[in-house]
């Protein structure tokens, strides 16, 4: 079964996120558990936690259908010690917030070397950062998102994701989220079913489908292999509809949150309905 949704707003309170997801016909959702552009946030109160859990139950969302995203400020591979510690503290707080909310996944961008340290050193720092957070939390999996490779961001090659996982001590609590726009911009072709087969065969060989814990379904304004991160609505960009139809009809993508971060929230309900229809079309066939 496919869990399909979008990254919805938690404005006005975390408990509003499940309702907003339900309104667009989603069976999954992503959210920020705090302001993503600030380092610090007030601790979660028992009331906020209870309200969120009640809303999830009301709208039939289990933890397996929810893919929280951490702050954009965090860089777990930062080359400067003081800044690295600040990011690690913030990441631990994000993991603990998920733990308090009964969530089991935390999606994050791996990190950037900022042209100051070697790629290998940065990847090792990211893995160490994950180990530190996992040692102080329980039940939450750190879900590494592939990047487009813009600037000095790492995680744009499957080999880089595999290297981070290799450095994580508890393999049961590390996973990967594949963003289709990022993959395409990083040079992994998705424009035809044959290209999708090839790209995900490579993913399976290098990373492994056992680590796939979520996906971001985005078309791309950016060109193939451009290393530029620019999302687009499904079928409107340079990837096209075929990739998303192919994903919907492949059982390897069952049981994980498939999250839209496409650029027009006004048509998310339509995009979700279209994705669901592709799945039904395969079942009928």
From Swiss-Prot:
Zn(2+) 1 binds at residues 69, 109, 145. Pfam families: AP_endonuc_2. SMART domains: AP2Ec. Keywords: DNA damage, DNA repair, Endonuclease, Hydrolase, Metal-binding, Nuclease, Zinc. It catalyses: Endonucleolytic cleavage to 5'-phosphooligonucleotide end-products. Its EC number is 3.1.21.2. Zn(2+) 2 binds at residues 145, 179, 216, 261. The keyword Nuclease applies. Zn(2+) 3 binds at residues 182, 229, 231. The keyword RNA-binding does not apply. Its cofactor is Zn(2+). It comes from the Bacteria. Binds 3 Zn(2+) ions. GO terms for molecular function: deoxyribonuclease IV (phage-T4-induced) activity; DNA binding; DNA-(apurinic or apyrimidinic site) endonuclease activity; phosphoric diester hydrolase activity; zinc ion binding. One of its GO terms (biological process) is base-excision repair. Belongs to the AP endonuclease 2 family. Endonuclease IV plays a role in DNA repair. It cleaves phosphodiester bonds at apurinic or apyrimidinic (AP) sites, generating a 3'-hydroxyl group and a 5'-terminal sugar phosphate. This is Probable endonuclease 4. It comes from Salmonella heidelberg (strain SL476).
């Amino acid at each position: 079964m496919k869990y399909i949704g979008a990254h919805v707003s938690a404005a006005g309170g975390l408990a509003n996120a499940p309702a907003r997801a339900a309104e667009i016909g989603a069976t999954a959702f992503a959210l920020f558990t705090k302001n993503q552009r600030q380092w610090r946030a007030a601790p979660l109160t028992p009331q906020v936690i209870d309200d969120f859990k009640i809303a999830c139950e009301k709208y039939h969302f289990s933890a397996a259908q929810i893919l929280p995203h951490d702050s954009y400020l965090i860089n777990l591979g930062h080359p400067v010690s003081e800044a690295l510690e600040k990011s690690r503290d913030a990441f631990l707080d994000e993991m603990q917030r998920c733990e308090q909310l009964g969530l089991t996944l935390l999606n994050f961008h791996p990190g950037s070397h900022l042209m100051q340290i070697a790629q290998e050193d940065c990847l090792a720092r990211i893995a160490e950062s994950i180990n530190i957070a996992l040692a102080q939390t329980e039940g939450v999996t750190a879900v590494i998102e592939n990047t487009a490779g813009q600037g000095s961001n790492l995680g744009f090659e499957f080999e880089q994701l595999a290297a981070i996982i290799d450095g994580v001590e508890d393999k049961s609590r590390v996973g990967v989220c594949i963003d289709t726009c990022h993959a395409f911009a990083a040079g992994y072709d998705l424009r035809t079913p044959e290209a999708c087969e090839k790209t995900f065969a490579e993913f399976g060989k290098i990373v492994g489908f056992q680590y796939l814990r979520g996906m971001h379904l985005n078309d791309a304004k950016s060109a193939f292999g451009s290393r530029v991160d620019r999302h687009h609505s499904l079928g409107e960009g340079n990837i096209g509809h075929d990739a998303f139809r192919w994903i919907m009809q492949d059982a390897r993508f069952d049981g994980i949150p498939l999250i839209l971060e496409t650029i027009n929230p006004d048509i998310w309900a339509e995009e979700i309905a279209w994705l669901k229809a592709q799945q039904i079309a395969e079942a009928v066939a």
